Swiss-Prot record:
It catalyses: L-histidinol phosphate + H2O = L-histidinol + phosphate. The keyword Amino-acid biosynthesis applies. PANTHER family: PHOSPHATASE RV3661-RELATED, PHOSPHOSERINE PHOSPHATASE. Pathway: Amino-acid biosynthesis; L-histidine biosynthesis; L-histidine from 5-phospho-alpha-D-ribose 1-diphosphate: step 8/9. This is Histidinol-phosphatase. InterPro entries: HAD-like_SerB, HAD-like_sf, HAD_hydro_SerB1, HAD_sf. GO terms for biological process: L-histidine biosynthetic process. One of its GO terms (molecular function) is hydrolase activity. It is an enzyme of class 3 (hydrolase). Keywords: Amino-acid biosynthesis, Histidine biosynthesis, Hydrolase, Magnesium, Metal-binding. Belongs to the HAD-like hydrolase superfamily. SerB family.
């Protein structure tokens, strides 16, 4: 069985679910909009530039999880899915998932965005295996802290390798689809790296290395 690995944000989605979640919270008046938006945008700019402090970012994004009851978070997320995520699910991305599924490949979404945000999205896309940044839980609610290695840059390789070892799998014949140079460590590990609507830095790298470049837009 070959693996088909997919980044989520700006790969299978026409946008960034993590950043969009923050924008949705601001629009709903659930956080201090001016302060939150400024920090959210600054972190996103750092991500695009490849210099994100992932632990600081996760502390920022998960703070609201730690101070909100689970039932309320689930209600908000259902609204977020309907209002924000559904319109940015890419039909060509779903077709690509279906193509790999029909070929008998094991589908995996591997994303830096936390599991609270991405779990329902992976379910919506019909992908059972999700490797994401983990949110610590205690007594049935989020603590607001990150648990385990953040699934970002080299952390994606660490988290994936652990999952491979636990499941007796390897990367022989594996594909990985991503839009971002932040995913270069994992792109270099697979048999078939594919740049999807890549950012300028990944496009240059893919062209230099002769990697396929595709668009799902």
């Amino acid at each position: 069985m070959r693996l088909a690995l997919f980044d989520l944000d700006n790969t299978l989605l026409a946008g960034d679910s993590d950043h969009s979640w923050g924008e949705w919270l601001c629009q709903r008046g659930l956080v201090d909009a001016a302060e939150y938006q400024a920090r959210n945008d600054a972190f996103y700019a750092d991500y695009v530039a490849g210099k994100l402090d992932v632990l600081a970012y996760q502390a920022f994004t998960q703070a609201i999880l730690g101070r909100t009851e689970m039932a309320q978070l689930e209600t908000w997320h259902r609204q977020f899915m309907q209002e924000v995520i559904e319109p940015i699910v890419l039909a060509k991305g779903e077709a690509l998932l279906a193509e790999h599924r029909a070929a008998g490949d094991r589908l995996v979404i591997i994303t830096a965005t936390n599991r609270f945000v991405t779990g329902p999205i992976a379910e919506r896309l019909g992908v059972e295996t999700l490797i994401a940044t983990e949110c610590e839980m205690r007594d049935g609610r989020y603590t607001g802290q990150t648990f385990d290695v953040p699934c970002f840059q080299g952390g994606k390789v660490v988290r994936l390798q652990r999952w491979l070892d636990e499941n007796g799998l390897d990367l022989e014949g594996a594909s990985f689809y991503s839009d971002s140079l932040n995913d270069l460590p994992l792109l270099e590990k697979v048999s078939r790296p594919v740049a999807v609507d890549p950012d300028p830095r990944l496009r240059a790298e893919a062209e230099k290395r002769g990697w396929p470049i595709i668009s799902l837009r």
